[in-house]
Amino acid sequence: MADVYPVDPAFAADARITREQYATLYRESIEHPEQFWGKAAQRLDWFKQPTQIKDVSFALDDFHVRWFGDGELNASVNCLDRQLATRGDKTALLFEPDSPDSPSYPVTYRELYERVCKLGNALRNLGVKKGDRVTIYLPMIVDAAVAMLACARIGAVHSVVFGGFAANSIADRVIDCQSKLIITADEGLRGGKKIPLKANVDAALKIPGTNTVETVLVVRHTGGAVDMQAPRDRWFHDVVDGQPAECEPERMNAEDPLFILYTSGSTGKPKGVLHTTAGYLLFASYTHEVVFDLREDDIYWCTADVGWVTGHSYIVYGPLANGATAVMFEGVPNYPNVSRFWEVIDKHQVTIFYTAPTAIRALMREGEAPVKKTSRSSLRLLGSVGEPINPEAWRWYYEVVGDSRCPIVDTWWQTETGGILISPLAGAVDLKPGSATLPFFGVQPALVDAEGKILEGATEGNLVLLDSWPGQMRTVYGDHQRFIDTYFRTYPGSYFTGDGCRRDADGYYWITGRVDDVINVSGHRIGTAEVESALVSHPKVAEAAVVGFPHDVKGQGIYAYVTLIAGETPSEELHKELVSWVRKEIGPIASPDHLQWAPGLPKTRSGKIMRRILRKIAENAPDQLGDTSTLADPSVVDSLVNERLTR
């Protein structure tokens, strides 16, 4: 089996960036960042051209990150208005519904522009002003993109909440950003099942602290019956349809907020990652164009949900700013059958396909036949995102899905980074299965040891970034101190990613996974603290500890150790009740895969839970527990090892 897949000369001959260009541009981006990003800023349309390009300090006593600080622009103008002259009739979004029996349809740039303007006017009429926060809780439908761009047009800050989150998670996010308006739908559709979106919003708005919400706009999607409370609830079409199809865009400073997106942290509640207008939009569009080697006639499909950052950057902002055609898929990979992805590729003649290793591993289990019965001959480039892809899944993706003729861009980045930071460029970089390979322009990765010493050469350590890039998050909304403490205090002067990483002799980067208390489940980050606090909030639970363990399909699964209060006994019923309790508190993505009853948890004499030991037990590696002599009661470990569920 090949360990290196050299650049295909035929691909390279036509590629946007060649090997030589990559080396030259990367060097310029590191040695002369102002010059490099000043030129790159010309990708955007500005009301006022920036003269200040980079103003950055990671020093704890003078921390600031500003890019293009005196520039003025509007993100929706860059995604829509500037496309109208030459691409007005081009398809911007190609909607593919949950069921293949429902109609798919294209939305042109001109239609999208008009829909965005109408909603922008409606939001202004409802009192939404520049800087107000709007929560978007929608399925994967075109109106989700319309809602995001309409907020951007009038200078409102959108906070998109993934449609799989439950009422408590919605309420947490609404309360944290003091949202003024919510845009939702009657119901979502996913794999043939209905998701009660409006009912979830109703439940969320009964929770104390959510009373900043004045209006709920409801998209009629499935036509399902929902409870409408006047005057708070309004039908989306009633408010939007009569509006003018022109809407004056707000002039935004480069550093004005564009959106907040909540992501799991290693402690407590989710944090609101705040991205600003110019740097984010520039970085999303630039990475999208270069990493995916974009052409004017590409049909590009990213299978993510807009509720995650991948959907923000690589379905909405990046592709539309580039005038691309993006597929928007409401469904799931295995409904109504496990050929669905490949059937959609053939139906729409998709040329670039970007999905998560979890989906690849799940479909790989179904064998080659469901793939081979489709053509996929339109494909020219494949991408992977969300978590490290194991070499076996990489090879299957390359050989079976891409017929050994499509390069794979294995992209590493985070909600916090706004866009792709480490990835091969298909015309410039040889591929290695499982490696994210080399950094994008302007990105300076380094590996450090536990003390923060920079490690040279082929080695393994914690991944940090030595300098800023335009797509970098600017703060945790409403909690700047948490931002500094989380990302910049561990290794002063650097941004700490929270990921471990190996660098090989060729300088290629191999992401090894989180080194903090965050689990990467199917490419979605789940904080162990969130799941623990959900479990402990159940009246019968005294204590809980949650760790990740290797999972064949999801990458990592959730393993929970639960200690019940005195007088309660474990049962199959209580097991089911606790799993559904977590689903209700957070959402289905946080459901524990294993829940082990624990008479006690391994603690130090000072009362700290030794998660390292729990991790090894969950990984079925009881011979690697290390020193347990510091535990208050070492016998606890023996009983946990004997009862472990992953043997």
UniProtKB/Swiss-Prot annotation:
HAMAP family, sorted: Ac_CoA_synth
Modified residues (N6-acetyllysine): 608
Modifications made to the protein after synthesis: Acetylated. Deacetylation by the SIR2-homolog deacetylase activates the enzyme.
Catalytic function, reaction form: acetate + ATP + CoA = acetyl-CoA + AMP + diphosphate
Organism from which the protein derives: Xanthomonas campestris pv. campestris (strain ATCC 33913 / DSM 3586 / NCPPB 528 / LMG 568 / P 25)
MF GO annotations: acetate-CoA ligase activity; AMP binding; ATP binding; metal ion binding
Protein name, entry field: Acetyl-coenzyme A synthetase
Binding site for Mg(2+): 536, 538, 541
E.C. number(s) listed in UniProt: 6.2.1.1
GO biological process: acetyl-CoA biosynthetic process; acetyl-CoA biosynthetic process from acetate
GO cellular component: cytosol
Chain sites annotated for binding ATP: 386-388, 410-415, 499, 514, 525
